[in-house]
From Swiss-Prot:
It comes from Mus musculus (Mouse). It is found in: Cytoplasm. GO terms for molecular function: ATPase binding; protein methyltransferase activity; protein-lysine N-methyltransferase activity. Protein N-lysine methyltransferase that specifically trimethylates 'Lys-315' of VCP/p97; this modification may decrease VCP ATPase activity. Disruption phenotype: Deficient mice are viable, fertile and have no obvious pathological phenotype. This is Protein N-lysine methyltransferase METTL21D. The gene is Vcpkmt.
Length: 228
C-alpha cells in the first residue's frame, strides 16, 4: 500500500521525498524529514485519505465533489491530504503548528503546478481561538487521534470550526499498542457528545490504498434540538 519513497541526493538520512501517484498519472512529491517529530512524515492514514478523495464514490459525476469547495486540513504535517484536495479543485487551508510551516510551504511550492484550486498554509494550535478562519465545507484530518492530551483541544477546534453544513472526514489508523485503544475509545466518547458520525465501509476506500486497520469516518455537528 505504501507510496514510493524517493531519497534526496544531498542527505538521504536526513530528508526524503514520498511520491504519491494520482489517478490521472500525475505525481505529488512530499518532502519529509527523518527527524523532527510525528508531523514530519507522511503517515499511511494520510495516503489512504488522499486516495479516497479520488475515488468515484466520493468524487461524484461531473465536477469533482471538492471543486470550488472550501477545505481545511487539521494537523496537516507534510500537507499530503490538503494538497491532494487542492489538486482536485478545492480551496484549501493546511494548518499545523508554527514549527511545521516551512515544511508545509515547501511542499506547497513543490506541487503548485498540480493545484487546480488554491492552497495556503496557516498556523493553528488546537484549542486556541480561530478568529481568522471561517467554517469550511470540509474539514480533513488524518491520524490526529494520537496523544491523549490533545483530544479535548482537538474537539474544541472541531466544534469551533464546524458549521451546520460542514462535513468532517477523519481517517485514522487503529493501533493496539500501549494506551492507543483507550485514547481512541475516549475520543469517540467525547465526540458523540456534540457530533454524529458514521464509518465508511472498507469497500468504498481506494481499491489499492486501503487497510483493515485504517478507518475513514464522516463526522457532522449535531443539529440543535428544537425547543420543547
Amino acid at each position: 500500500m505504501a507510496a514510493a519513497v524517493e531519497p534526496e541526493v544531498e542527505d538521504p538520512l536526513w530528508s526524503f521525498v514520498r511520491v504519491l501517484e494520482k489517478r490521472d498519472g500525475t505525481v505529488l512529491r512530499l518532502q519529509q524529514y527523518g527527524s523532527g517529530g510525528v508531523g514530519c512524515v507522511v503517515w499511511d492514514a494520510a495516503i489512504v485519505l488522499s486516495k479516497y478523495l479520488e475515488t468515484p464514490g466520493f468524487s461524484g459525476d461531473g465536477a469533482h465533489a471538492l471543486s470550488r469547495r472550501s477545505v481545511l486540513e487539521l494537523g496537516s504535517g507534510t500537507g499530503a491530504v490538503g494538497l491532494m484536495a487542492a489538486t482536485l479543485g478545492a480551496d484549501v487551508i493546511v494548518t499545523d503548528l508554527e514549527e511545521l510551516q516551512d515544511l508545509l510551504k515547501m511542499n506547497i511550492d513543490m506541487n503548485k503546478h498540480l493545484v487546480t484550486g488554491s492552497v495556503q498554509a496557516k498556523v493553528l494550535k488546537w484549542g486556541e481561538d480561530i478568529e481568522d478562519l471561517m467554517s469550511p465545507d470540509y474539514i480533513l484530518m488524518a491520524d490526529c487521534i494520537y496523544y491523549e492530551e490533545s483530544l479535548e483541544p482537538l474537539l474544541k477546534t472541531l466544534k469551533d470550526l464546524s458549521g451546520s453544513e460542514t462535513c468532517i472526514i477523519c481517517c485514522y489508523e487503529q493501533r493496539t499498542m500501549g494506551k492507543n485503544p483507550e485514547i481512541e475509545k475516549k475520543y469517540f466518547e467525547l465526540l458523540q457528545l456534540d457530533f454524529d458520525f458514521e464509518e465508511i465501509p472498507l469497500d468504498k476506500h481506494d481499491e489499492e490504498y486501503r487497510s483493515e486497520d485504517i478507518h475513514i469516518v464522516y463526522i457532522r455537528k449535531k443539529k440543535p434540538k428544537p425547543p420543547s
